[in-house]
């Protein structure tokens, strides 16, 4: 679960790029 929290933050930061947002979906 702790890993998920770290990933959430990671995706959140890169979400601005818009690239990883597509990968996350």
Swiss-Prot record:
- Membrane-crossing ranges are none
Q: What class of enzyme is it?
A: hydrolase
Q: What does this protein do?
A: Alpha-amylase inhibitor, active against Z.subfasciatus alpha-amylase (ZSA) but not porcine pancreatic alpha-amylase (PPA). Has chitinase activity.
UniProt-recorded name of the protein: Chitinolytic alpha-amylase inhibitor PvCAI
Its recorded reaction(s) are:
Random endo-hydrolysis of N-acetyl-beta-D-glucosaminide (1->4)-beta-linkages in chitin and chitodextrins
Q: Which organism is it from?
A: Phaseolus vulgaris
Alphabetically, the GO molecular function entries are: alpha-amylase inhibitor activity; chitinase activity; endochitinase activity
Q: What family does the database annotate? A: Belongs to the glycosyl hydrolase 18 family. Chitinase class II subfamily.
Query: What are the recorded Gene Ontology BP terms?
Result: chitin catabolic process; polysaccharide catabolic process
Any idea which UniProt keywords this protein has? Answer: Alpha-amylase inhibitor, Carbohydrate metabolism, Chitin degradation, Glycosidase, Hydrolase, Polysaccharide degradation
- EC no.? 3.2.1.14
Assembly mode: Homodimer.
């Amino acid at each position: 679960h702790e890993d998920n929290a770290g990933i959430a933050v990671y995706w959140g930061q890169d979400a601005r790029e818009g690239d990883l947002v597509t990968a996350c979906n």
